[in-house]
């Protein structure tokens, strides 16, 4: 029974790889969407055809991008290519982190438990609240003067 489950996991992983041996994952955060491609390599990470260190000058965003690879110990064994659009740098970093986690789950199905317990496969559903009429922003009212 365990052998059947193991072969099923292997065939599912084999089906999800493209002809070049790469796997894809899509991540979203706020208004950002990231398409992440993971393949065997030396640890290079490119975001929109630029090194991720140049693309994300803020260390917090770089750490968010690397978080999945560091957790799985795959920082030096895979290359990551990302196309990301929309939103700001923090939203894009979050979208990349989710897309990378989904791609790594396809790359090796044994990683799923670790990714799920660390919360990397959970979509952060928080979105910007819309501005309401009769107010200055989503919640803040206009300045009030008694006299």
Q: Where in this protein do the model-derived segments appear?
A:
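Structured, basic alpha/beta domains of bacterial-type, RNA-associated proteins
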Residues: 2-4, 10-28, 34-85, 90-147
């Amino acid at each position: 029974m365990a052998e059947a489950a193991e072969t099923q996991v292997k065939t599912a992983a084999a089906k999800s790889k493209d002809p070049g041996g790469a796997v894809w994952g899509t991540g979203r955060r706020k208004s950002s969407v990231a398409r992440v491609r993971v393949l065997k390599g030396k640890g290079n990470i490119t975001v929109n055809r630029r090194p991720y260190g140049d693309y994300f000058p803020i260390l917090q965003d770089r750490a968010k991008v690397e978080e999945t690879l560091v957790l799985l110990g795959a920082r030096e064994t895979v290359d990551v290519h990302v196309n990301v659009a929309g939103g700001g740098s923090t939203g894009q970093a979050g979208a990349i982190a989710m897309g990378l986690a989904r791609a790594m789950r396809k790359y090796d199905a044994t990683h799923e438990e670790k990714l799920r317990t660390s919360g990397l496969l959970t979509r952060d559903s928080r979105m910007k609240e819309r501005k309401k009429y009769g107010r200055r922003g989503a919640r803040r009212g206009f300045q009030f003067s008694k006299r």
